[in-house]
Amino acid sequence: MAFQGTSRTLTQQSSAATSDELQKLLFSPEAIKKMATECDLGRHHWMRADNAISVRPLVPEVTHGRIASFFKSGYDAGELSSKGYMSVTQVLCAVTRTVSTDAEGSLRIYLADLGDKELSPIDRQCVTLHNHDLPALVSFQPTYDCPMESVGNRKRCFAVVIERHGYIEYTGTTASVCSNWQARFSSKNNNYTHIAAGKTLVLPFNRLAEQTKPSAVARLLKSQLNNIESSQYVLTDAKINQNARSESEEIIVESPPIVIGSSSASRSEAFRPQVVNGL
């Protein structure tokens, strides 16, 4: 079945053979291995003095090229509506320190577009975490879908950039960053609208949880939920609601959307990543 011009997903727009071809490109043993080795998906990345700046694309270069070729061939044949887009709902980074709180240093983490030669943060989504702020959970939300194209000799896609500053007397690992995301590829791009700031509850990790009575855990959870309005858990920064037709699960609890036309829905509004301390 050729492309029908509807807003359905790519796998519904194309034939089973075409869908299988795309699945093989994304989930072949080689592609999965490169997602781990080149992108550090779900792996702990150690920040050392000899690795002070890390740029990790969300799609391996080889996989990017094959997916782009797949969409281009479908577009040239008139079967697909575009040459392909990459959609990422959210990038979640768990950051933990591996030195004492007395160490003087910080990490600067942001989301960038490899199509930007300067690698500037997307819509100023950038956060600086001092060593004493860790551990922390950082959430980035791209505000647009990335076209599957090449810019010069660069394969364009989103990337997580991590910079290590300070830690003068520490040459070894001072922090560990574990990033997770889910990339989707489609011949149609999504629309993104602004909503009010959301709230996230993160309970401290209890190493003695197995030896704690269930009733005590239940009381702790109930107490935290009752105090959710406390400033410790309020994320005051604006976030992006992604009205994409996908089945991905929402990790952040969102409040109702802002009324269109209000001052808070202005495009000039600064977007910032959400940070939660106390993992």
UniProtKB/Swiss-Prot annotation:
GO cellular component: host cell plasmodesma
Keyword Transport recorded: yes
Chief location category: host cell
Pfam families: 3A (PF00803)
Keyword entries, A-Z: Host cell junction, Transport, Viral movement protein
Protein localization: Host cell junction, Host plasmodesma
One GO term (biological process): transport of virus in host, cell to cell
Keyword flag Transit peptide: no
Function: Transports viral genome to neighboring plant cells directly through plasmosdesmata, without any budding. The movement protein allows efficient cell to cell propagation, by bypassing the host cell wall barrier. Acts by forming a tubular structure at the host plasmodesmata, enlarging it enough to allow free passage of virion capsids.
Similarity comment text for this entry: Belongs to the cucumovirus movement protein family.
Protein name, as recorded: Movement protein
Organism: Cucumber mosaic virus (strain Ixora)
Native organism taxonomy: Viruses, Riboviria, Orthornavirae, Kitrinoviricota, Alsuviricetes
